[in-house]
Amino acid sequence: MSRYRGPRLKIVRRLGPLPGFTQKLYKSKSQYLGSSTTSSSSNKKISQYNIRLLEKQKLRFYYGLTERQLLKYVTIARNAKGPTGQVLLQLLEMRLDNIVFRLGMAPTIPAARQLVNHRHILVNDFTVNIPSYSCKLGDKISVQKRFESKTNIFANSTQSASLKVPSHLTLNPAKNEGLVHQIVDREFIGAKINELLVVEYYSRQV
């Protein structure tokens, strides 16, 4: 399954707020948390499978993953030490496109992915154009010194002013660079997801 490229508000109305997916939800939350979800849930009982499916979809759309990519991350998380759900979220949070977003250099993860693809982002002073690149402790995330790169980042930083940089990252606005100084704690995960439901959804596939 390819990455979703359709109307984002359609997804937000169905799944609820997804700040990493689109910034539009901040303008009028009531439109997306309205009667459609409430009425449908009261008229018919949602199966456990559908509950897990919706949670999986939230995670997939928030981080902008294909189905194959998400399944790969779940497989890695299950084979790693520690709670599978927590490890899964940590893996996703350490993606370069997400780090750029969480640093406030882009208004959404898709916008951050575009910056990475266009070679505007440096990791430890080397250009990295792979959005799925897994950042490590001590990695420095900075911006190409070309004028157009700075212009793009400054514009995105203004749009992202409402986003708070999480505690596992530090941002130096003067140098337009950030640092990954620890593994993200569960409470600072960007996506408001019940990761256990996602793990349960994939339990028969992994």
Curated annotation (Swiss-Prot):
Q: Name one GO biological process term.
A: translation
Where is it found, in Gene Ontology cellular component terms? chloroplast; small ribosomal subunit
* Alphabetized Gene3D superfamilies for the sequence: Ribosomal Protein S4 Delta 41, Chain A, domain 1 (1.10.1050.10), RNA-binding S4 domain (3.10.290.10)
Compartmental location: Plastid, Chloroplast
Spell out the coiled coil positions from the record: none
Q: Name one Pfam family in it.
A: Ribosomal_S4
Keywords assigned: Chloroplast, Plastid, Ribonucleoprotein, Ribosomal protein, RNA-binding, rRNA-binding
Any single GO molecular-function term of the entry would be:
rRNA binding
Every S4 RNA-binding domain range: 94-152
Instruction: Tell me which SMART domains the record gives.
Output: Ribosomal_S4, S4
The source's domain of life comes to Eukaryota
Subunit note: Part of the 30S ribosomal subunit. Contacts protein S5. The interaction surface between S4 and S5 is involved in control of translational fidelity.
Q: Which PANTHER family match?
A: 30S 40S RIBOSOMAL PROTEIN, SMALL RIBOSOMAL SUBUNIT PROTEIN US4M
Its job: One of the primary rRNA binding proteins, it binds directly to 16S rRNA where it nucleates assembly of the body of the 30S subunit. With S5 and S12 plays an important role in translational accuracy.
Protein family: Belongs to the universal ribosomal protein uS4 family.
Q: What is this protein called?
A: Small ribosomal subunit protein uS4c
Protein's organism: Chara vulgaris
GN (gene name): rps4
